[in-house]
């Protein structure tokens, strides 16, 4: 029963798409279990760049089963746009299955998301305005529409009309904005439902059967641990659980069916949107990392905030995910720096703090305590083995390992699939 969960162990954008794509070559099944199309992941195949927001990364392999699990919030319009891209590339899409339990994102979710964020003023939380939070809100208050209900043409109209009436009251009376016309939305989404119906099934059965048959199953994470609604830097978080604990629920499997948890971390730290960031470099060093690493959001295009590797943070995410291994991404970006820094503690009101605070006000008062390591000048993008890496690069990797307490089994030295150093195979 080989099964691997891939989680982002920072604030998202760690490079999960590349590692999932790499491991998907050997997997039989790839499963997404949370989030929606608010998170983007980029995959390079030869010189072709693919950006996905909702589809699992295994879709580029026609012999893999790709599952969008019950914990995902599903944007039909976004899904069909990504399907169209694959079809234009001649890629078969019959290997994609969507759980009938996913909650559907409608235009009113996106509008409310936008209006709520604008109403926050200076207290904005950095939402992507994709309707993710409002959709999860409907799910929790048990008023949402699930995909299995959307493809049921007998019930869908009544369900949607009631939701549009309710949401128009919020949009028009609270935010004084223009609401939606029910019939037009119904006709559009009925068309989507008919196109999507062939992909819809009970995917919990497929996941269980694959694991029972001891197939290689890859659980694909979106966003990052510190965006978890419970364990992240609240309120600057997402509305789901991008931690390892979210996968059993979001895919409909038992927790004992997960064997390995691989944490994806950048060799430095980035963040998109608002919130405290202890190791942020708001200077020319941060700018250099941003430009070399092409640190701009896949979904929003926003420049990412950049900083040194925060070991305190990653030690926290290692603990709450139960990481069994790490993959260190974008190590090549750090070539050419005379000195590198790793945060190994925080100073809080004159005291040394070794743990990541739960309260963001406390976190905002923390100043990073750094260990300095010598950098390297060599271009490492064509290196294939760990032994080839410069000595200082190896010392940097080994210091992260020793501090965090988890082995780094994969190292990325470039965006392409073949620019990956494997220290120990996972599948």
UniProtKB/Swiss-Prot annotation:
Claim: Cytoplasm is one of the keywords in the record: yes
Cofactor, how bound (note): Binds 1 Mg(2+) ion per subunit.
GO annotations of cellular component type: cytoplasm
EC category: ligase
Any one GO BP annotation for this protein: 'de novo' AMP biosynthetic process
Entry annotation: catalytic residues: 13 (proton acceptor), 41 (proton donor)
GO molecular function: adenylosuccinate synthase activity; GTP binding; magnesium ion binding
Listed cofactors: Mg(2+)
Protein family according to the UniProt entry: Belongs to the adenylosuccinate synthetase family.
HAMAP family: Adenylosucc_synth (MF_00011)
Protein name per its UniProtKB record: Adenylosuccinate synthetase
Organism: Alkaliphilus metalliredigens (strain QYMF)
Record gene name: purA
């Amino acid at each position: 029963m080989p099964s691997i969960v891939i989680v982002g162990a920072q604030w998202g954008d760690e490079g999960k798409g590349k590692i999932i794509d790499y491991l998907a070559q050997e997997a039989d099944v790839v499963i997404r279990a949370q989030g929606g199309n608010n998170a983007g992941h980029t995959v390079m195949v030869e010189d072709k760049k693919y950006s996905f927001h909702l589809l699992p990364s295994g879709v580029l392999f026609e012999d893999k089963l790709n599952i969008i699990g019950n914990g995902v919030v599903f944007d039909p319009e976004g899904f069909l746009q990504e399907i169209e891209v694959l079809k234009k590339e001649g890629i078969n899409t019959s290997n994609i299955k969507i759980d009938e339990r996913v909650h559907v994102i409608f235009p009113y979710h996106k509008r409310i998301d936008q209006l709520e964020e604008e109403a926050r003023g200076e207290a904005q939380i950095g939402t992507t305005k994709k309707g993710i939070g409002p959709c999860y809100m409907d799910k929790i208050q048990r008023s949402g529409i699930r995909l299995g209900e959307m493809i049921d043409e007998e019930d869908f109209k009544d369900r949607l009309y009631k939701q549009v009436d309710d949401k128009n009251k919020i949009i028009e009376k609270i935010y004084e904005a223009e609401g939606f016309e029910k019939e037009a939305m119904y006709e559009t989404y009925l068309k989507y439902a008919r196109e999507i119906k062939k992909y819809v099934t009970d995917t919990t059965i497929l996941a269980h059967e694959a694991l029972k048959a001891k197939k290689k199953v890859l659980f694909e994470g979106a966003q990052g641990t510190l965006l978890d609604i419970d364990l992240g830097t609240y309120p600057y978080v997402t509305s789901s659980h991008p931690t390892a604990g979210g996968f059993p629920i979001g895919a409909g499997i038992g927790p004992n069916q997960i064997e390995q948890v691989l944490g994806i971390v950048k060799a430095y730290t980035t963040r998109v949107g608002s919130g405290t960031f202890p190791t942020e470099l708001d200077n020319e060093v941060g700018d250099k990392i941003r430009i070399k690493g092409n640190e701009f959001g896949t979904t929003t295009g926003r420049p990412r905030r950049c900083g040194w590797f925060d070991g305190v943070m990653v030690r926290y995410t290692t603990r709450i995910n139960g990481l069994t291994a790490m993959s260190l991404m974008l190590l090549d970006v750090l070539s050419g720096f005379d000195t590198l820094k790793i945060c190994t503690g925080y100073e809080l009101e004159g005291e040394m703090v070794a743990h990541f605070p739960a309260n963001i006000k406390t976190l905002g008062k923390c100043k990073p305590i750094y260990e300095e390591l010598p950098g390297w000048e060599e271009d490492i993008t064509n290196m294939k083995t760990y032994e080839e890496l410069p000595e200082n690069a190896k010392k940097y990797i080994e210091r992260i390992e020793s501090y965090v307490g988890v082995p780094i089994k994969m190292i990325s030295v470039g965006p392409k699939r073949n620019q990956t150093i494997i220290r120990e195979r996972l599948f």
